[in-house]
Amino acid sequence: MNAMKRGLCCVLLLCGAVFALPSQEIHARVRRGARSYQVICRDEKTQMIYQQHQSWLRPVLRSNRVEYCWCNSGRAQCHSVPVRSCSEPRCFNGGTCQQALYFSDFVCQCPEGFAGKCCEIDTRATCYEDQGISYRGTWSTAESGAECTNWNSSALAQKPYSGRRPDAIRLGLGNHNYCRNPDRDSKPWCYVFKAGKYSSEFCSTPACSEGNSDCYFGNGLAYRGTHSLTESGASCLLWNSMILIGKVYTAQNPNAQALGLGKHNYCRNPDGDAKPWCHVLKNRRLTWEYCDVPSCSTCGLRQYSQPQFRIKGGLFADIASHPWQAAIFARHRRSPGERFLCGGILISSCWILSAAHCFQERFPPHHLTVILGRTYRVVPGEEEQKFEVEKYIVHKEFDDDTYDNDIALLQLKSDSSRCAQESSVVRTVCLPPADLQLPDWTECELSGYGKHEALSPFYSERLKEAHVRLYPSSRCTSQHLLNRTVADNMLCAGDTRSGGPQANLHDACQGDSGGPLVCLNDGRMTLVGIISWGLGCGEKDVPGVYTKVTNYLDWIHDNMRP
């Protein structure tokens, strides 16, 4: 187990009358990844940051005094000032507001359990409810383990959400780096600095609903289930066992209740390890082991960002909005190097779905490469994952004339039982329940690296997304598709907007084959179709045709079995 982290804090005792001095609690930081370096002040107690020449009030510990501070060249100059009660309420959660006597700055004296400029931060919140829109806790770590950036950082000034917005307090944003969900995404998130730039990432904040589950989310910090066996099959020791005297994480820990420890032997993760664990006796020796608690599925969850650029046939997109999208490359026998072949869909750690017609050349498996987590088709992504192919399975009844049974499975090669590692840009899509029947004209999404239009000689350089609607079966017939065969294993979807010859209708196109058609179902993006074929690209009143995934669930599961 990791040793308990300990921190030391130096407190400066301020004595005597009013005079200015540099604060020992506030240090200079130089932010990275910007065009120029900027010195700022950071309060180590509150984690608040202040720009050059910015002023603020702060209470003095163990005193009724209030100080006025000013950030000057990375050092805070502070002195005591007289205050009075605020003329209007500005503090939440029972906080007491005091305003400087001679200027408008104010400070809130917060009750126990609350912090922040306006006492808006709930320091006791350990998990989030629903989507976490109302979450006001102090979790500040992203799923990748990166530390969140302060919402007031000048590096975020041009981002859509920062602590400088007029409605920042209402959204939970401010001078802190805690996870929030200001845009009603699927869960709390924050900005992190990675690979020389700031980008948004979901947080590892535990969901309150996962506490009593039979599985765990993230690393299982909030797991409160009743599993009590380790991966080796050993029984966990009671957390209050006398054998554990001297250990840090026991039922005697001062924070035992908050950590989920007590008079039981259930698996827990009190120290933020990789997953739930417990103490065990092995060969008469006290040790610890990870537990056999399964990880909860996060299929179909994503960090969706609104596309900024409209292009022919759809919209440019980021891979984080479609983290199940795969790019399949092939080495052809008669040409050097790898070439983009088709799209694919991540449905489990080691399995990719695609279209059967992509593999009509019968490539040897070692000539295929699958890339996950890539926004630009031929430009490596910062967090992409690349795999060789162990084998691929094309449906035995695939008809290369009608494209009936246009489905294939690729198994990724790995030295372990796991292949793709879940991240904000790599995640599985949910397979549909067998009885899923979505209403006609349901709006869904497709994604891929295909051409912008049918006559284009080039594939898209960047991932695209398109929004289409499911056609009723009465409109998905040969009569509507120039007498091409439309089998029961197919479904149709298209852009139903009206428009003239110049209308930019969304649709799949050459190169998108094998990619996903996903629809929202029970709060998760669910795979409904596999991009298969069509007549042209983006033709008015002409839908695209997709392999109907619900018809192949047994085939998928049978072929994925060891």
From Swiss-Prot:
The active site is at H357 (charge relay system), D406 (charge relay system), S513 (charge relay system). Residues 42-52 are annotated as: Important for binding to annexin A2. InterPro entries: EGF-like_dom, Fibronectin_type1, Kringle, Kringle-like, Kringle_CS, Kringle_sf, Peptidase_S1_PA, Peptidase_S1_PA_chymotrypsin. It catalyses: Specific cleavage of Arg-|-Val bond in plasminogen to form plasmin. It comes from the Eukaryota. It holds the Pfam family Kringle. Keywords: Cleavage on pair of basic residues, Disulfide bond, EGF-like domain, Glycoprotein, Hydrolase, Kringle, Plasminogen activation, Protease, Repeat, Secreted, Serine protease, Signal, Zymogen. Residues 82-120 form the EGF-like domain. It is an enzyme of class 3 (hydrolase). The single chain, almost fully active enzyme, can be further processed into a two-chain fully active form by a cleavage after Arg-310 catalyzed by plasmin, tissue kallikrein or factor Xa. Residues 21-32, 33-35 form a propeptide. Its EC number is 3.4.21.68. Inhibited by SERPINA5. Inhibited by SERPINE1. Disulfide bonds join C41-C71, C69-C78, C86-C97, C91-C108, C110-C119, C127-C208, C148-C190, C179-C203, C215-C296, C236-C278, C267-C291, C299-C430, C342-C358, C350-C419, C444-C519, C476-C492, C509-C537. Heterodimer of chain A and chain B held by a disulfide bond. Binds to fibrin with high affinity. This interaction leads to an increase in the catalytic efficiency of the enzyme due to an increase in affinity for plasminogen. Similarly, binding to heparin increases the activation of plasminogen. Binds to annexin A2, cytokeratin-8, fibronectin and laminin. Binds to mannose receptor and the low-density lipoprotein receptor-related protein (LRP1); these proteins are involved in TPA clearance. Binds LRP1B; binding is followed by internalization and degradation. Forms heterodimer with SERPINA5. PANTHER family: TISSUE-TYPE PLASMINOGEN ACTIVATOR, TRYPSIN-RELATED. Converts the abundant, but inactive, zymogen plasminogen to plasmin by hydrolyzing a single Arg-Val bond in plasminogen. By controlling plasmin-mediated proteolysis, it plays an important role in tissue remodeling and degradation, in cell migration and many other physiopathological events. During oocyte activation, plays a role in cortical granule reaction in the zona reaction, which contributes to the block to polyspermy. Belongs to the peptidase S1 family. This is Tissue-type plasminogen activator.
